[in-house]
Amino acid sequence: MFLSMNWIQDFVDLSGLDKIELIRKFSLSTAEVENDILRKGSEISGIVVGEIKSVENHPDSKKLHLLKIDAGEDELIDVVCGAPNVKVGLKTAFAKVGAKIGEITITPRALAGFTSNGMCCSEAEIGISDDNSGIMEITDDVKNGTDLKDIYEIDDIVFEVDNKSLTNRPDLWGHYGIAREFAALAGRELKPFDLDDLKAYDGLKKIDMKIEDTLCQRYSCLQIENINRNVSPVNMRIRLFYCGMRAVSYT
């Protein structure tokens, strides 16, 4: 089971403490931490919000586009991009010259006869999801030139716990239970877990059900209503991806 320190810190304030040391203490006192502790986001820098101001088709390529990007600087930046979802007004993750993605440092690069002074990135390229279908799409309310790490929880510390060591601890099968352990280790207060007033659901219509086989001692049903198909918030998608899961539609 992968665990996110950002998620844990929703429930306990660990500011000012050495998170790596806390994870090591957790491994010794509660459950074995497997493999390496991952510092997510440490491999990228210089990724900012860039707005596409113009789009032209490449004269010699059906796949490439010539873009002008507003990255919050005095002048627009010329970029060559082959993503299928480019359009004027789209804000995206833009790696400026000098930005780093893993072991790659972005430099001016000649592509099909034009110089690209940066790179428009997909979520997969910056390591926050496996979506490489096109460049990342960012909401219009974010200022051009804003560092992506200032608006999204890209920096995180993720560690993996051996499931076998938690078999007899169902209270640790989620981030809140793990946060309780960290609160004890750090001497910090555990924040209450807010729940809806369950009495508000007492009057719900019961599900009609008939058990025909007397050998069936119990059968449970759950009805879920008012589900929407909205895209999950970016930070939630990042957390799920870091923990080895994907945000998928119920359909």
Residue positions per predicted region:
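Extended, well-folded interaction surfaces typified by the phenylalanyl-tRNA synthetase beta subunit core
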Residues: 177, 236, 246-248
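Phosphate-backbone binding interfaces of nucleic-acid-interacting proteins
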Residues: 1-203
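Residues forming anionic-ligand binding surfaces in small-molecule and nucleic-acid pockets
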Residues: 148-164, 205-243
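Conserved small/polar residues in nucleotide/adenosyl-binding loops
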Residues: 251
